[in-house]
């Protein structure tokens, strides 16, 4: 390895440099254009530093390291569309999706907001929004939801009537009202409990809302515009059980190991559940460190 004019040699190396989430051009190439002629990655926001460009991953790929994972798959969260391009952090995450409805730019629902507990689904919504026209979503709640979720740094758009809310969001008012009224009519009364998979659900509605479905009818009303927020990407180096990198053709590297997000694709294909990233880093950090030290001694 070279640092300026200095050359550093090692008997073994552990690469733990993360993904390529900050390289918008790479994201753009991976995602390509959608049917509407849009480049979805142009509307992605990066939750962390602007410097995670995947340079070590690129170098390893060029040197013959095998890869694993879909370059479009990532830990991708629905975050406030008003967040900065980089470094918005966790405070921009919108956590009220399961308490309301999520609409696209056509004022249509497009997925079950109550499918499962939030820690199992929060990193799904960014990708779902990325697949919508304009890569924009609108999370709509009413006064009943206030105080039941971690409030993001940006306040919700607040109005006293639903038509006012539609206009404030820039959505077609008649279509918005039709969507909300249809949803409200489909809600079945149950015992609301956000801590369990409760029996508040919809009937005869596509897509269904299977839990925590309550009518949006109590003023004031709130909306949060959201965009895809990329935390880390899943494309990475292929490794064996000892965290040793595998080369194209299947053979093991002589002295290269990987840990953390740069090899997360070995574990994560799509989707996410809270804490898996830290678990991958912790487990494979220990494995890679142990095996690299053993390799160097031998």
For the regions a language model picked out, list residue spans one by one:
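Core beta-strand elements of the Rossmann-like FAD/NAD(P) dinucleotide-binding domain
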Residues: 2-12, 251-253
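Glycine-rich loop(s) and the adjacent beta-strand/alpha-helix scaffold that form part
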Residues: 8-80, 287
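Short acidic, glycine/proline-rich loop/turn micro-motifs
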Residues: 25-29, 151, 267-272
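An anion/pyrophosphate-binding glycine-rich loop and adjacent beta-alpha core
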Residues: 53, 57-177
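An active-site-proximal "capping" alpha-helix that borders the catalytic cofactor pocket
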Residues: 56-63, 277-295
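Short, small/polar residue-rich loop motifs at catalytic or cofactor-binding pockets
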Residues: 95-97, 231-233, 274
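A glycine-rich dinucleotide-binding beta-alpha-beta segment and adjacent secondary-structure elements
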Residues: 177-266, 270
